[in-house]
């Protein structure tokens, strides 16, 4: 029992203000990554919906058909060709948003990797920076 107490005391590491700042930054960035990944999933679902709409419009045989397209809270009827162009533009914009979000996730992951190295170097097994898989 005394041996484990001495071992625990030997493993005690002082946590400085800078260390606490790094831990807090790690926690904030981990939370931010989770939020960004959820946002990416929502946007990917929206993109899939736009792609499905494009396919449905292509399958429509009637070129004279006026298709309602939602802009804000209103639906405006457009020709099949105009609607197709608007959907393609919306898909392009949404893909750019997804790419930007994924880029942000990658940059945050690099910061987290650097912080992990620094914190594990100082605290070793006294700190757990791995995400829960629950």
Curated annotation (Swiss-Prot):
Phosphoserine PTM positions: 125
Mitochondrion keyword on record: yes
Keyword Signal: no
Compartments (UniProt record): Nucleus; Cytoplasm; Mitochondrion
Alphabetized UniProt keyword annotations: Acetylation, Chaperone, Cytoplasm, Mitochondrion, Nucleus, Phosphoprotein
An example Gene Ontology CC term for this record: mitochondrion
Domain of life: Eukaryota
Gene Ontology molecular function: unfolded protein binding
InterPro entries found in the cross-reference section: PFD_beta-like, PFDN4, Prefoldin
Residue numbers of N-acetylalanine PTMs: 2
SUPFAM superfamilies: Prefoldin (SSF46579)
GO biological process, one term: protein folding
PANTHER family cross-referenced by the UniProt entry: PREFOLDIN SUBUNIT 4
Subunit structure: Heterohexamer of two PFD-alpha type and four PFD-beta type subunits. Interacts with URI1; the interaction is phosphorylation-dependent and occurs in a growth-dependent manner.
Sequence similarity: Belongs to the prefoldin subunit beta family.
Function: Binds specifically to cytosolic chaperonin (c-CPN) and transfers target proteins to it. Binds to nascent polypeptide chain and promotes folding in an environment in which there are many competing pathways for nonnative proteins.
The protein's name: Prefoldin subunit 4
Chain's gene name: PFDN4
